[in-house]
Design a protein with these regions (language model features):
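C-terminal motif of bacterial Sec signal peptides marking the signal peptidase cleavage site
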Residues: 20-24
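Extracytoplasmic/periplasmic copper-protein system
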Residues: 32-46, 142-160
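N-terminal edge beta-strand
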Residues: 46-60
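Intrinsically disordered, low-complexity Pro/Gly/Ser/Thr-rich segments with frequent PxxP/GP/PP motifs
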Residues: 88-116
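Extracytosolic low-complexity repeat regions of secreted or lipid-anchored proteins
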Residues: 105-148
Length: 160
């Protein structure tokens, strides 16, 4: 073989080796599209396998005012479940009995926070308790009526 042919073979070998190395990166990388997430303004919390708190947030007009809780608790299991939410620093958790393969719309439950300890745009602590000893504190967003969907909610909630 001539020197030119050997150089071409060496270059081809480098290209093939580089392609193999780059392709192997995909094997070690977890595709982000397989991660569950809540495409919303609120938070999503996996309480247990099949039990989630979805889109949890508090809407208020201002710090110190009443806050209205938005979100839902979803139970995709075959058994009823109890989930407790303590939003803010109230110290009195609200229990929710979520039926098997059912959900609870927190907006319809008329859950409120008497006096929100944070301004819109900040977060307040929420303690979430559930089956199997689940007990976590999460930062829950506080929003105001800037977005039309929340302005409508505040108008409805404060109407006489």
């Amino acid at each position: 073989m001539t020197m030119a042919v050997l150089k071409r073979l060496a270059r081809a070998g480098v290209v093939l080796a580089s392609a193999a190395v780059l392709a192997s990166c995909q094997l070690a990388t977890h595709p982000i599209t397989t991660n569950g997430y809540g495409p919303s303004d609120g938070i999503r919390v996996v309480v247990a396998d099949g039990i989630n708190v979805e889109n949890l947030l508090v809407v208020t007009e201002a710090e110190g005012e009443t806050g209205y809780v938005i979100g839902s608790i979803v139970n995709n299991t075959g058994t009823d479940a109890t989930v407790l939410l303590d939003i803010g620093e109230s110290g009195s958790p609200s229990p929710f009995e979520v039926p098997a393969r059912g959900n609870i719309n927190l907006t319809e439950s008329d859950m409120t926070v008497e006096s929100v300890d944070a301004a819109p745009g900040a977060t307040i602590p929420t303690t979430i308790q559930g089956p199997d000893g689940f007990n976590e504190v999460r930062a829950t967003p506080v929003l105001d009526g800037t977005l039309p969907e929340y302005a409508e909610f505040l108008e409805t909630a404060t109407a006489p």
